[in-house]
From Swiss-Prot:
Pathway: Cell wall biogenesis; peptidoglycan biosynthesis
Enzyme Commission code: 1.3.1.98
Catalytic activity: UDP-N-acetyl-alpha-D-muramate + NADP(+) = UDP-N-acetyl-3-O-(1-carboxyvinyl)-alpha-D-glucosamine + NADPH + H(+)
Gene3D superfamilies: 3.30.465.10, UDP-N-acetylenolpyruvoylglucosamine reductase, C-terminal domain, Uridine Diphospho-n-acetylenolpyruvylglucosamine Reductase, domain 2
UniProt KW Cytoplasm keyword: yes
Subcellular location: Cytoplasm
Enzyme class: oxidoreductase
Protein name: UDP-N-acetylenolpyruvoylglucosamine reductase
Cited InterPro entries: FAD-bd_PCMH (IPR016166), FAD-bd_PCMH-like_sf (IPR036318), FAD-bd_PCMH_sub1 (IPR016167), FAD-bd_PCMH_sub2 (IPR016169), MurB (IPR003170), MurB_C (IPR011601), MurB_C_sf (IPR036635), Oxid_FAD_bind_N (IPR006094)
Length: 301
């Protein structure tokens, strides 16, 4: 029996798609074909996938909702898992629990509806709750580390564990999950009671700032670089004269130099080449070496 036949038998009922390009699902609108693109509906299906991948020695990767990543044009080997369907969110007192595939922006709106404060900083961050925990997503002085109470993960051995915020050893755009091989299943956030109008005003203010400063009208991978100590990446790129700098179909945004936008059917290679070129030119101009925030995954074509 071939691996594919075995997969269809053992993983019957799970939504598995073969040779389906990731550019249809990524925020950058680039990305080649994974071997198997999977949309699990619940933790049980995710655990079945993990057991099968371990038994058959098939690589697997969870992409959340593919927002702060670039998938290379040659695609990704093994299972690629999109968790959009694991999206339940519940509220218990001042605590919100959200599954990994829940939309982060929508989760902040649920907090607003329940007059819970603390999540406002994330009201414009695209992506999933799982990805936000993985990256310790943040903006405007707030970050996931400030509000996370605990999270459930599926370990690389297929076990479910509950981790505290301390266990995750959060740092700037970093959590211990990045090295552990575990996958976020859900997260609990400890918020505080607030006033609906005040929370809404703050979310409206931050949303307006994003719309003013960020090129939301174009496909992009979000913020490309981490913030260098004592500097702002966008400012360094701008000072190096790189606004509008373009390779292939991807260019440095004129609106915010910390973003690279897909303006003309760009490819992952265009993104990668532009990122490397910007790092080199900023280093030449200011002496500062930029570090990527966006993850680049998969194989070149």
């Amino acid at each position: 029996m071939s691996v594919r036949e075995k997969m269809l038998e053992i993983l019957e009922g799970i939504d598995i798609r073969f040779k389906e390009p990731l550019h249809s699902y990524s925020y950058t609108k680039v990305g080649g074909e994974p071997d198997y693109l999977v949309f699990p509906r619940n933790r049980c299906e995710l655990a079945r996938l993990k057991r099968f991948s371990n038994q058959e020695h098939i690589p697997w990767m969870v992409l959340g909702n593919a927002s702060n990543i670039i998938v290379r044009d040659g695609g990704i080997r093994g299972f690629v898992i999109l968790c959009d369907k694991l999206n339940n969110v519940s509220v218990d007192g001042y605590t919100i629990e959200a599954e990994a595939g829940a939309n982060l922006i929508e989760t902040t709106r649920i907090a607003l509806r329940h007059s819970l404060t603390g999540f406002e900083f994330a009201c414009g961050i695209p992506g999933s709750v799982g990805g936000a925990v993985f990256m310790n997503a943040g903006a405007y002085g707030g970050e996931i580390a400030h509000i996370l109470q605990s999270c459930k993960v599926l370990t690389k051995d297929g076990e479910i564990e509950t981790l505290s915020a301390k266990d995750l050893a959060f740092g700037y755009r970093h959590s211990a999950i990045q090295e552990s091989g575990s996958v976020v299943l859900s997260a609990k956030f400890a918020l505080a009671p607030g006033t609906h109008q005040v929370i809404k005003q703050e979310m409206d203010r931050l949303t307006h700032l994003r719309e003013l400063k960020q090129p939301l009208e174009y496909p992009s991978c979000g913020s490309v670089f981490k913030r260098p100590v004592g500097h702002f990446a966008g400012q360094l790129i701008s000072e190096a004269g790189l606004k509008g700098y373009r390779i292939g179909g991807v260019e440095v945004s004129e609106k915010h130099a910390g973003f690279m936008i897909n303006v003309a059917d760009g490819t992952a290679k265009d993104y990668e080449d532009l990122i490397e070129s910007v790092i080199e030119k900023v280093k030449e101009h200011s002496g500062v070496t930029l570090e990527r925030e966006v993850r680049i995954l998969g194989e070149s074509k």
